[in-house]
Amino acid sequence: GVILVNLKKGTRDGEVHTTYSAAVTFNKAKKELDIMNAEEYRAYRTVSNPLSDMGASTDWFDAVTRLGVTHMHTLTFSGGNARTNYRVTADYRKAQGIDLRSDRREYGARATISHTTKDGLFTFAANMTPRVIDRNKSASVYGSVIKNNPTMPVYDPESANGYYRFPSGGDSSNIVEQLNEEENGTEIKLLEWNATAAVNLLPLFNPNNPNMVLKSQVTVSQYQVDKFNGWFIPSTYG
């Protein structure tokens, strides 16, 4: 099958039109995890294992979350006349997630141009949409929040990178250190374009009715995706 997408086109009044829009949104986690705080953990665990009390009082949920802020900006230029018109839109979006790792930066553009010859016989059109997406995430944030001992501290001024080093061999980790020190992201580059050449033959055979259309067209298009995944752990971590 064939899918036809109608894109916004430029104006035909001979003027250049410019529009700009911006928006800011905020996101905050609603704390719904019913887990032990440090005092409850001490009352439950130290009865059978006094060594499990590491002396701190850490709210791991608060330690890994933040206020998420998203900025969005869009700028558009359009113009043209009865035979040629164009429209160019550029946008930028930066989203900071509610955990320390998650974020997304995205920017791109969409350009369209079309031209019809004076006799209305030929029409040429082209569209191009490039886009770049950078994103970071961690799949283990809230699992660590649930498992971590709330008497474990986050920071240790004596360690090489300033974070408390969890005992090896356990199933918990300093998730704050992991989110801040590790790099685990994806970069995606997208490019979509198409060009169309069309001919309307009917006016040649029936010049008395130029509004009638018998169109034949050829379209060439391409969709390209480049994806890069990167992961880095510094030597001071772990």
Where do the model's predicted regions map?
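Short loop/turn motifs that connect adjacent beta-strands in outer-membrane beta-barrel proteins
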Residues: 10-16, 80-83, 118-124, 202-214, ...
